[in-house]
A protein has these predicted regions:
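Cysteine-dependent hydrolase recognition
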Residues: 1-213
């Protein structure tokens, strides 16, 4: 089909999935066949994923991505879960039409529940607490979200954390800088027995970007 495409967005999604993102999140227009009118994610892209050892959890607040009860349609959500070479380990996603205001509530409640620094939380617990969140006022909308996957699975939270104790406030191109810190547990205690390599990622300053309508 014709229409504008965002090929860079499609490539970036595939790269993040392949690298093993913990959670892949999308909120916006979509349907049974994928995300967005520009088809930034579709069945062809999903079926090409080969991230079998690095399966993320998908949180998608978009219409009917996993309409599993229509035998005539193989939905994008089903393709993500059942891709034999990759895809996702589970999805908190939609089986029917949903609406933007309610989607934002569910999306925010999910992340506040999933990333509350509580180790060992199962997907079923996260799903339950998300659906019961006081933030959600549109319960008709939230009932169209379902957990597709094993509710006993835990998110792959890192057991070790990197804590910085000294970071320069300014970094310029080609500068040599010294950053100090330590590897610790979730409580901030130093893990003196740690023996490994820490790979830093440096981000540029925030920038505003305008995309096509």
């Amino acid at each position: 089909p014709g229409g504008e495409r965002y090929e860079d967005a499609t490539s970036e999604i595939a790269r993040r999935v392949d690298e093993g993102a913990l959670i892949v999140n999308y909120i916006g227009h979509g349907g049974e066949r994928g995300w967005a009118h520009e088809r930034i994610l579709n069945l062809e892209t999903i079926n090409a994923w080969t991230n079998l050892r690095r399966l993320p959890v998908f949180m998608t607040a978009t219409c009917e991505l996993f309409r599993y009860d229509d035998p005539d349609i193989y939905s994008a959500g089903e393709a993500i879960l059942f891709n034999p070479q990759g895809g996702g380990v589970a999805l908190l996603t939609t089986t029917r039409t949903v609406y933007s205001s309610g989607n934002q509530q569910v999306n925010r409640a999910f992340f506040e529940t999933a990333l509350d620094d509580t180790q060992g939380r199962r997907l079923g617990d996260i799903y339950r607490d998300t659906k019961n969140s006081e933030q959600i006022t549109s319960h008709t909308n939230s009932r169209n979200f379902s957990l597709m996957g094993d509710p006993a699975l835990e998110l792959a939270y890192p057991a070790k954390h990197v804590y910085f104790t000294e970071v320069p406030d300014t970094m310029r191109s080609l500068d040599e800088v010294v950053i100090r810190g330590y590897v610790g547990n979730a409580k901030g205690d130093v893990l003196s027995e740690f023996d490994g390599v820490v790979v830093p990622t440096v981000f540029d300053k925030r920038a505003s970007v305008t995309t096509l309508d």
